[in-house]
């Protein structure tokens, strides 16, 4: 399995999804070598799979200590050599150079290995070249797992043509493609010209053991928010990377409209990203900076506590292939509001939906929930029944079935190819 990050050295949901997915696969009998482009300790992952390093480079972090997953979430991520990175010299210059280096190391590893993998599973565009070269070196079938396309990361714009090309060739070379939602599958078929029959929708899920409730509000990092809730305020939260793809400027504009009708609202935005300063300035320009809190990147207990204190969770993404945080929010009895371009809406139906650009409708929904305890309760109870049906075990069993089909088909085609060679020689 080829991936670009794993917790605790992750900067977003890709690493979380890969970790939980691999854990469930291991519980269903898969033996996994997970190869990363950096060298670091992963004690939790080591408990159920073999985590390998393709290079001796450490994980990259910015000046605030946040991890940088070069290009995993944005075509404009900081590159090696960026002034924001403490360990820039550990990587070759340029994002494509980093992916080439990773691919070189993967090819060397599989050629020098004592065993041949039964299947190669590559996560997103950064590992696709490595997946192709590993397939060529070993003859093993390749599965490409698309968590997001460049069209998603560009937030409705065309994005980086080089990344489009890498994604296209990776999906062409794949024996099977996993897409995290029907929305993503439709993009793969429509924008990349891939046959629909080659793409399997595999929704993400959640692991409740990773989302245990905190035991006491006295230890929380959010005393202020708890105090404001006792005064009748509602907490509206968005947790994501602060990038154009996530549509947070629309949420802040909707917040202005909502606050004009119900001043007892506090908006909390958790996450880090290149749009942070722009969003802070937008809140100030709109005169609501006293009602919008930016927490920075959150993980662990602070991450869980933020969900717990929230009344509403909003995902205003312009293009969201899945949206794992919405499932997590549902676990914490939070009313969920989703843009219509969020893939998690294929799993969660007891939610409020809106077009990402329709700030007036989003404001209406926020105000409606904030003023109606009955509506909030109905949404929370309805969504609870849906997330209780979600589990990584079912996802893993579906993937194991697909693995078996791909391996069997690969063997059949290899046998046919050998027979043809014999016939041609004769």
Model segments located where?
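A conserved catalytic-core segment of Leloir-type glycosyltransferases
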Residues: 24, 30-114
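A short helix/loop element that forms part of the nucleotide-sugar donor recognition site in Leloir-type
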Residues: 212-229
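Conserved donor-binding/catalytic core segment of Leloir-type glycosyltransferases
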Residues: 229-246, 252-255
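Short alpha-helical donor nucleotide-sugar binding micro-motif in glycosyltransferases
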Residues: 297-298, 305-310
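Aromatic "clamp/platform" in nucleotide-sugar-dependent glycosyltransferases that forms part
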Residues: 318
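Conserved acidic donor-binding segment of nucleotide-sugar-dependent glycosyltransferases
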Residues: 351-360, 368-373
């Amino acid at each position: 399995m080829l991936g670009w990050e794993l917790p605790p050295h992750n900067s977003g949901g890709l690493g979380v999804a890969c970790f939980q997915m691999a854990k469930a696969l291991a519980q269903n009998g898969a033996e996994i070598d997970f190869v990363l482009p950096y060298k670091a300790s992963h004690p939790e992952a080591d408990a159920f799979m073999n985590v390998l390093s393709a290079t001796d480079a450490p994980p990259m972090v910015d000046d605030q200590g946040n991890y940088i997953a070069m290009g995993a979430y944005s075509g404009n991520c900081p590159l090696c050599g960026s002034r924001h990175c403490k360990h820039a010299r550990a990587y070759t210059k340029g994002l494509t150079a980093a992916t080439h280096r990773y691919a070189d190391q993967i090819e060397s590893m599989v050629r020098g290995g004592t065993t041949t993998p039964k299947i190669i599973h590559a996560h997103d565009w950064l590992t696709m070249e490595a997946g192709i070269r590993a397939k060529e070196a070993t003859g093993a079938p390749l599965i490409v797992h698309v968590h997001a396309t460049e069209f998603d990361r560009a937030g409705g714009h065309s994005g980086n043509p080089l990344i489009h090309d890498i994604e296209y060739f990776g999906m062409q070379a794949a024996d099977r493609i996993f897409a995290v939602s029907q929305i993503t599958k439709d993009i793969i078929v429509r924008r990349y010209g891939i046959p629909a029959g080659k793409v399997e929708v595999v929704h993400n899920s959640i692991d409740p053991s990773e989302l245990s409730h905190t035991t006491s509000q006295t230890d929380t990092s959010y005393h202020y928010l708890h105090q404001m809730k006792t005064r009748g305020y509602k907490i509206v939260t968005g947790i994501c990377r602060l990038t154009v793809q996530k549509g947070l400027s629309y949420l802040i504009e909707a917040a202005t409209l909502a606050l004009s009708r119900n001043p007892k609202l506090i908006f909390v935005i958790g996450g880090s990203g290149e749009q942070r300063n722009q969003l802070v300035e937008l809140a100030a320009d709109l005169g609501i900076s006293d009602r919008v809190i930016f927490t920075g990147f959150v993980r662990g207990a602070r991450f869980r506590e933020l969900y717990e204190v929230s009344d509403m969770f909003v995902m205003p993404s312009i293009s969201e292939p899945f949206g794992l945080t919405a499932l997590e929010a549902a676990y914490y009895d939070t009313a969920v509001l989703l843009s219509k371009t969020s893939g998690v809406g294929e799993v969660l139906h007891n939610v409020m939906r809106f077009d990402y650009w329709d700030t007036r409708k989003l404001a209406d929904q926020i105000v409606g929930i904030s003023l109606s305890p009955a509506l909030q309760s109905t949404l929370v109870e309805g969504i609870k029944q849906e997330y209780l049906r979600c589990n990584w075990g079912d996802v893993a069993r579906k993937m194991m079935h697909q693995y078996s089909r791909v391996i069997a088909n690969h063997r059949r085609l290899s046998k046919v190819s050998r027979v043809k060679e014999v016939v041609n020689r004769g």
